[in-house]
Every structure is written in structure tokens, then in C-alpha cells.
From Swiss-Prot:
Residue intervals passing through the bilayer: 29-49
Tissue expression remark: Expressed in the dorsal blastopore lip and in the presumptive neuroectoderm in stage 11 embryos. During gastrulation, strongly expressed in the involuting mesoderm. At stages 13 and 16, expressed in the neural plate and neural fold, paraxial mesoderm and notochord. At stages 19 and 22 (neural tube and early tailbud), strongly expressed in the neural tube and notochord. At the tadpole stage, expressed in the head region, branchial arches and otic and optic primordia. Also localized in the notochord and weakly expressed in the somites. In adults, expressed in the brain and ovary.
Lineage: Eukaryota, Metazoa, Chordata, Craniata, Vertebrata
Organism: Xenopus laevis
Record's catalysed reaction(s): an N-acetyl-alpha-neuraminyl-(2->3)-beta-D-galactosyl derivative + CMP-N-acetyl-beta-neuraminate = an N-acetyl-alpha-neuraminyl-(2->8)-N-acetyl-alpha-neuraminyl-(2->3)-beta-D-galactosyl derivative + CMP + H(+); a ganglioside GM3 (d18:1(4E)) + CMP-N-acetyl-beta-neuraminate = a ganglioside GD3 (d18:1(4E)) + CMP + H(+); a ganglioside GD3 (d18:1(4E)) + CMP-N-acetyl-beta-neuraminate = a ganglioside GT3 (d18:1(4E)) + CMP + H(+); a ganglioside GD1a (d18:1(4E)) + CMP-N-acetyl-beta-neuraminate = a ganglioside GT1a (d18:1(4E)) + CMP + H(+)
Keyword Disulfide bond found: yes
InterPro entries (UniProt xref): Glyco_trans_29, Glycosyltr_29_Sialyltrsf, GT29-like_sf, Sialyl_trans
Localization of this protein: Golgi apparatus membrane
Keywords: Developmental protein, Disulfide bond, Glycoprotein, Glycosyltransferase, Golgi apparatus, Lipid biosynthesis, Lipid metabolism, Membrane, Signal-anchor, Sphingolipid metabolism, Transferase, Transmembrane, Transmembrane helix
Residues annotated as catalytic: H324 (proton donor/acceptor)
PANTHER family per the UniProt record, alphabetical: ALPHA-2,8-SIALYLTRANSFERASE (PTHR11987), ALPHA-N-ACETYLNEURAMINIDE ALPHA-2,8-SIALYLTRANSFERASE (PTHR11987:SF3)
Pathway, per record: Protein modification; protein glycosylation; Lipid metabolism; sphingolipid metabolism
Protein task: Catalyzes the addition of sialic acid in alpha 2,8-linkage to the sialic acid moiety of the ganglioside GM3 to form ganglioside GD3; gangliosides are a subfamily of complex glycosphingolipds that contain one or more residues of sialic acid. Glycosphingolipids are required for convergence extension movements during early development. Can catalyze the addition of a second alpha-2,8- sialic acid to GD3 to form GT3. Can use GM1b, GD1a and GT1b as acceptor substrates to synthesize GD1c, GT1a and GQ1b respectively.
Gene Ontology MF terms in the entry: alpha-N-acetylneuraminate alpha-2,8-sialyltransferase activity
Protein name: Alpha-N-acetylneuraminide alpha-2,8-sialyltransferase
Length: 359
């Protein structure tokens, strides 16, 4: 399944080919190197990098030009759902279950090469028999954490959905509820959050339980089997919530689902080390839900009115560079919006009646 790289060095006693040389700017450059350079140029022409993507001003122009008109295209939605079903089978593979994971199975991590885990009785006992999410879902809200949500007054509209997905333990305190709502059926948690904010639950179990209580009776969705270092923190989350008798249920992301979703979007032109959590959730929602509206998916520093906005609605902490391809992801989602597959909320849901927001 996993290929291995072979060394390029020649064997002793075997004559090595002479690489032809060509003159360039007074020096000599291997012909192979020039061919490689041409290949790289062609690659960036065919698969342009971020510098060739539309900037925020161009995207604002496109969004404003498209206007508020939007209609759900059920035919396009059904076709896209079939694509996701064929590649990734989200209803069956979205989370780890006893039904999709055999005892003794060698489970390959999706975020690391050559790393796997053998599923034993202890690990398998943490999985539900089948997915506990009752399918199909009718209306879903997927809430990203983009700064465009600030002062959007979209909270009420978000909460009207039957199923609300949120990403990476976002704050839902009173100062934000007008904009992002409070309802949550599923919230994702990256193991890195458990490490940075809760010291891997070695000393901060109670503070973690208090933090997730805001999500009430929801599913806590964790990529426990994406990297080896993320497995133990994810299992600690499971045991912590179980020990405290909370209302949350931990679901572990199936690495086969995450891997296949990554391949799917790569085939569509998203070239990144790893997809954002938001795009994983949108992909799941488009398969599990009949109607999908997404909020807070805007990777630019200005809103539609040309005003500077923070990276998140709650802070301005920037992500690590080189991991995600947020503009490329946005363009894919914008195309789905224009096609009527999903609705992307980019403007205020309710217009402000005063300069000061009521609370």
C-alpha cells in the first residue's frame, strides 16, 4: 500500500551515464536541471500557487457582483452528494464504529506515512456499534470561525438549523451569541488544542469539562488517528468526559474518511498539506444533510464593505503558514454556492439598527 523511495546512487562497478551540459549565462548547467526547471514552470502554470489566486479585492468584487440572489439547486446538490458518496462514503465512514472497524485491523494514520495502529479490544470498545447520528439530516449549519462573523448578527439564523457543526472548541459566551448562536450538535477538537490549552488533560481535566459544557448534549469529534501524537490526548478526552458523566459523546474521525476527502479535494485543485477542519466538516455535511448553509468561511482580511476584520471572530491569531490552502478552499466553496449546492453566508443576517450591538 505504501511505496518506498529508493536511493538514486549508482552501484559500484557500474558505469554512470554522462549528463549532457548546456551553457547558460557563462556557466554550465546540467541539461536535466534545465528540464526540471521547465517542468516546475509548467507545473505552476497548470496548478497555480496562492499568488495567482484572486486577492481579497477581486473576491469582494465577485461576491458583490453575484449579489444576494441565490437558489438551492437540488439536482446539483444530489450530483455533488453522489460524488462524495462514491469517493468517501461519509454515512458509513464519518466516524469510527464497530461496524466499520474490525478487531485486529491495521488502521493507517492519515496524517503520517508508515504509521499504523492495530485495533485491540480496548480501543474498539470506545466505538459505537453504528453512527449515532440519525440520518438523513434536514437542515445543517456549518460554522467556521472567520472574523467575518463578528457583528454579523447571524446567531438566530444559525440556531434555526436542525444540526449545527462547529470547529475547534470556539467560544460561545454571551458577547458572541448574537453573531454565532449557541446551538451545537457537533463540535470538533484538534488534539493540539488539548495540548496547548489543557496540558493534555494531565492537570486540567475539570477546566476542560467546564469549557465543553457550553456545547451541551453534543458530539465531540476528534481526529484521534491522524497522527500518533494525537491518539493519547484524544483517548484522554473520551475518558475524561466519561469519568465526569457529561452530556457529550466522543466520536473519533475515521482516518480513511479524512484521507479520501483530502484526495477528493486535491483532485478539485486544493493543494495543501492538509485540509482545514472547516472543509472536512462541510464535506461531511454535504453528504449527511439535505440543505447546508455555511458561516464564517472567509479567509481574507477585509469584509465585503472593505473594512479590516480579524482572522477569527474571537481573536486575530493567524494559522501556521504552509499547512492549509484557505483561498483555494474558499474558491471551491464559492463555486458550490454559485451552483446552488450550498449557501454561503457572507453578509450580515440582520442589519444593524444602531452603531452599538444590543446584548
Amino acid at each position: 500500500m505504501w511505496g518506498r523511495w529508493r536511493g538514486a546512487g549508482g552501484r559500484r562497478g557500474v558505469a554512470q551515464p554522462v549528463i549532457p551540459q548546456m551553457k547558460l549565462l557563462g556557466g554550465r548547467v546540467p541539461l536535466g536541471a534545465s528540464a526540471l526547471g521547465l517542468l516546475i514552470v509548467c507545473w505552476f502554470y497548470i496548478f497555480p500557487g496562492g499568488e495567482r489566486l484572486p486577492g481579497h479585492k477581486e473576491m469582494i468584487r465577485q461576491v458583490l457582483q453575484f449579489g444576494p440572489r441565490w437558489g438551492r439547486n437540488r439536482s446539483s446538490g444530489d450530483s455533488f452528494r453522489k460524488l462524495l458518496q462514491d469517493c468517501c462514503d461519509p454515512p458509513r465512514l464519518f466516524s469510527m464504529t464497530k461496524a466499520n472497524t474490525a478487531l485486529g485491523e491495521n488502521l493507517w494514520y492519515d496524517g503520517e506515512f508508515f504509521q499504523s495502529l492495530t485495533i485491540d479490544n480496548t480501543t474498539r470498545s470506545l466505538f459505537p456499534q453504528d453512527t449515532p447520528i440519525k440520518l438523513p439530516l434536514k437542515r445543517c449549519s456549518v460554522v467556521g470561525n472567520g472574523g467575518i462573523l463578528k457583528n454579523s448578527r447571524c446567531g438566530e439564523q444559525i440556531d434555526e438549523a436542525d444540526f449545527v457543526m462547529r470547529c475547534n472548541l470556539p467560544p460561545l459566551s454571551r458577547e458572541y451569541t448574537d453573531d454565532v448562536g449557541t446551538k451545537t450538535q457537533l463540535v470538533t477538537v484538534n488534539p493540539s488544542i488539548i495540548d496547548k490549552r489543557f496540558q493534555n488533560l494531565l492537570w486540567s481535566r475539570k477546566s476542560f469539562v467546564e469549557s465543553v459544557s457550553v456545547y451541551k448534549q453534543s458530539y465531540v469529534y476528534m481526529p484521534a488517528f491522524s497522527t500518533k501524537r494525537g491518539t493519547d490526548p484524544s483517548l484522554r478526552v473520551y475518558y475524561t468526559l466519561e469519568d465526569f458523566g457529561t452530556n457529550q459523546t466522543v466520536l473519533f474521525a475515521n482516518p480513511n474518511f479524512l484521507r479520501n476527502v483530502g484526495k477528493f479535494w486535491k483532485s478539485k485543485g486544493v493543494h495543501s498539506k492538509r485540509l482545514s477542519t472547516g472543509l472536512f466538516m462541510v464535506s461531511a455535511a454535504l453528504s449527511l444533510c439535505e440543505e447546508v448553509t455555511i458561516y464564517g468561511f472567509w479567509p481574507f482580511q477585509m469584509d465585503l464593505g472593505g473594512r479590516h476584520i480579524s482572522h477569527h471572530y474571537y481573536d486575530n491569531m493567524l494559522p501556521l503558514s504552509g499547512v492549509h490552502a484557505m483561498p483555494e478552499e474558499f474558491l471551491q466553496l464559492w463555486h458550490l454556492h454559485k451552483s446552488g449546492v450550498l449557501q454561503m453566508q457572507l453578509d450580515q443576517c440582520k442589519k444593524d439598527v444602531s452603531s452599538k450591538k444590543p446584548h
